[in-house]
Every structure is written in structure tokens, then in C-alpha cells.
């Protein structure tokens, strides 16, 4: 969790909250009602400005869920032919270590000897609007990018890249999904890194 930790280490106020909560209930499923889930979701949606939120256990699980949501939208709303949906990703990405996610990694150590790999992903140069536009076709469901890449250093795209990608997605009826596990929650001076570009992703 080296890149996902957003709350520091052993802050006294957080330790107390964690301890107090564990005395009440340590873990439960969304399948069961608790009196804290509603207020939690209300807080998250108010902070983020999105209408909905889905709590997950990890960044990789969140990305996997975003992939599933994008594919379902592509088949049900965009009417892409079944099992043909594609998602555009960037070279040098890091979204997690599940079997699906490593399938679109460009890092050999992350994917070698773990095949066969999951199809349905097209990788383009990070920061290139032209590459994104050229990769889009009738089967493109979504783009999935990090606003700032964190696997090989702190790699920022050109200033105009996210606004360009937003425009390209709007023009082609493609979802824009941003993974902010490493760049979100105030790490860049704003709640989400995409806010510096004055755009809003779909998820």
C-alpha cells in the first residue's frame, strides 16, 4: 500500500477512530445494513461531486469494477457488439496486480509468465492526444488513465492532455475513467489531480 496510503502512519486521531470503530464493528458487507454506510456515502459524494459512489477494498478492485461498468455501459447503452468492447489505456500504467489489470501493463515483470492475458485493451503513449484519437474505433467503450503516473516516477502529462482527452471522449461517445488511487485525496493540492485541468471524468 506504499502508493495508496493517504492518511499517513499512526496519526493519533486516526488510531483512536480505528480503535473505537473496531470495538463496535470491524468489517461488514454492503449486503447488510449499517447505520454508517449512508452517511459515509453522503460524505463521499458531497466531497467528490459525483452522484454515486461504491466502496471497495482496494484500488485494483475499484479499477476492475470500473472496467466492468464501462463494458456493461458499452453493450447496453452504446450498443457495441457483444464481447467486442475495447478500453484504451496508457503505456507505463499501474492500476494494480490482478490478472485482468496486468494484461494491459507494459511492464514485463508485471505480466511475464502470467498469460494468457485478458483481451480488450489498447495501449497508447501516455500524454499523447493524437494517439488516443487514433486508437478510438466503433468498439471503444472507455479510456482508463492516471492523471499522473506513479509507477516509474512522478510522470505528468502535458497540460492540455486531459482536456483534449475529455473532448475526444465527448466527440466519440466514449467514457473517460481516471484512476486517482495514487494522485487523489489532496496529494497534488486539490482533492483530485484532474481538477487542475478543469475537467470532470465520468468515473
Model-derived features: where do they sit?
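Conserved N-terminal phosphate-binding loop of PLP-dependent enzymes in the Aspartate aminotransferase
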Residues: 1-203
Amino acid at each position: 500500500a506504499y502508493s495508496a496510503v493517504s492518511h499517513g502512519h499512526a496519526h493519533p486521531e486516526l488510531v483512536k477512530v480505528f480503535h473505537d470503530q473496531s470495538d463496535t464493528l470491524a468489517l461488514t458487507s454492503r449486503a447488510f445494513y449499517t447505520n454508517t454506510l449512508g452517511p459515509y456515502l453522503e460524505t463521499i459524494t458531497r466531497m467528490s461531486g459525483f452522484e454515486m459512489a461504491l466502496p471497495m477494498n482496494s484500488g485494483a478492485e475499484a479499477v476492475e469494477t470500473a472496467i466492468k461498468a464501462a463494458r456493461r455501459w458499452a453493450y447496453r447503452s452504446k450498443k457495441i457488439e457483444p464481447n467486442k468492447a475495447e478500453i484504451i489505456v496508457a503505456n507505463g500504467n499501474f492500476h494494480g496486480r490482478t490478472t485482468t489489470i496486468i494484461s494491459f501493463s507494459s511492464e514485463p515483470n508485471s505480466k511475464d509468465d502470467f498469460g494468457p492475458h485478458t483481451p480488450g485493451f489498447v495501449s497508447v503513449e501516455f500524454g499523447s492526444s493524437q494517439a488516443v484519437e487514433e486508437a478510438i474505433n466503433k468498439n471503444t467503450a472507455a479510456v482508463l488513465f492516471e492523471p499522473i503516473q506513479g509507477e516509474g516516477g512522478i510522470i505528468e502529462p502535458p497540460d492540455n492532455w486531459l482536456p483534449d482527452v475529455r473532448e475526444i471522449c465527448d466527440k466519440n461517445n466514449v467514457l473517460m475513467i481516471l484512476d486517482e488511487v495514487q494522485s487523489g485525496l489532496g496529494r497534488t493540492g486539490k482533492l483530485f489531480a484532474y481538477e487542475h485541468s478543469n475537467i470532470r471524468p465520468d468515473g
